[in-house]
Amino acid sequence: MARQLALVHGRAGHVPRVTCVTCAAMRGDAALATTAAATPDAHSAQDRGGGATGPCARATSVPRAVIASSLPRPPWRTAGGSPLAVGAGACPYTPAVRELVSIAPDGAELFVDGRVLRVRGLAPDSDHEVAGIAFRTMPDLGALRCVFATGNDVHFGETVCGHVDDASGHEVFTSEPGATPYPEVMSRAAVAEIASCGPAAVVVKGDLTNDGEDEDYDAFLQVWGEAFGERLLHVRGNHDSYRGQGFAAWDRQVRVLDGVTLALLDTARPFEVGGSLSDEQLTWLDELGRTAHQPVVVLGHHPVSRDDELAPPFPLLSDDATVRLVEVMARRTSLTCYLAGHTHRNLVRRIEGVLCAEVACVKDFPGGWAEYRVHERGIAQVFHRVQAPEAVAWAERTRRMFGGLYGAYAMGRLEDRSFVVATR
């Protein structure tokens, strides 16, 4: 897989090495976990994706919110700036986990011993270490034009998480009796954090509900619509149309922002898990790409399909729709990337030069949303985990779904979560 962080300047080296043994084991890197465990004070094995080395400090007590430069003995080291780190309450479920969640031109996000830490105020293209995790910030992309955000797979109305079938034997997860349903907990946390970044637009890319019930769609609108009003764009997913329901079924939507145009497509088809695109949708997108005077980001619920080892065991966008979508986007260079949901994971592919990204879900682990910073020389995707303590607790419970395999599947690699989209 191409290293997406090198798209703008053709440079490698923006994918740091995460040297925590726990992270290594969770990601399925058995060799890394074994090597790291043998050298606990200076882990040096290679994380998938490569990058700079650095010692893995033992767990530290990270305060809930702290300006590092104000502490006489800060619990981490930095180089090139005095960051602002903002964290949420600790989670009791995975107290030993330390992960680099994402990087940005001015900072990074980490998950450290049950807290989400956001570090800001750093210089672009610079090396740092926070809580024993080394990373390099994204390159300087020029002046910021605007910010937009996306979420997907919020599943209002869902009551059981992790169920496959009665014979699977997998542990399932539910909200405690009398507690706020977990889809609402996760969405409210995401909405509050998205609102704080002042987005020009917010896009929810399908699976608004679990089973297409009108009352659940109303609940979605109450949480997301009341927060963002006219800034909100949303479209249905397969869970919203299993029984032929017709809400949020707009074939195509467009929103022009400062520095970028958003094109949202309805890929869902009634009574089907998989998705498709009509001739009319593709003709419209082709014409939009031909006449656009600024970069266009294309969005939909279903990701492109590929018959390879990364393909999930359920339908995605149809093969025909995938081929035709990629053909249009490869021909029209203003169409910069395709962003989807549906798979509940972070994954980036490049097909015929077209960047196609999947973003993990809001409703369970990792409990995430994506921020897109539109700069003069590229668009940075920065994946975020929700910070609210009750949301972190639920996300960490569901990390272990499907026999413990879900965590690594859903998180993906760093370059699946943080990358730069070249404005071609």
Label each region the model flagged:
Residues 376-424:
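A short C-terminal boundary segment appended to hydrolase-like catalytic domains
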Residues 152-185, 242-248, 270-277, 312-314, ...:
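Acidic/histidine-rich helix-loop elements
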Residues 157-160, 210-215, 239-245, 270-273, ...:
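Active-site environment of divalent metal-dependent phosphoester hydrolases
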Residues 24-33, 43-58, 64-67, 73:
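Residue-level detector of structural "landmarks"
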Residues 83-85, 89-114:
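Extracellular ectodomain segments of secreted/surface proteins
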Residues 190-201, 272-355, 405-424:
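His/acidic metal-ligating clusters that form di-metal
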Residues 136-140, 214-287, 324-325, 350-358, ...:
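Extended active-site neighborhood of metal-dependent phosphoesterases/phosphodiesterases
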Residues 118, 123-213, 291:
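N-terminal active-site segment of His-dependent metallophosphoesterases
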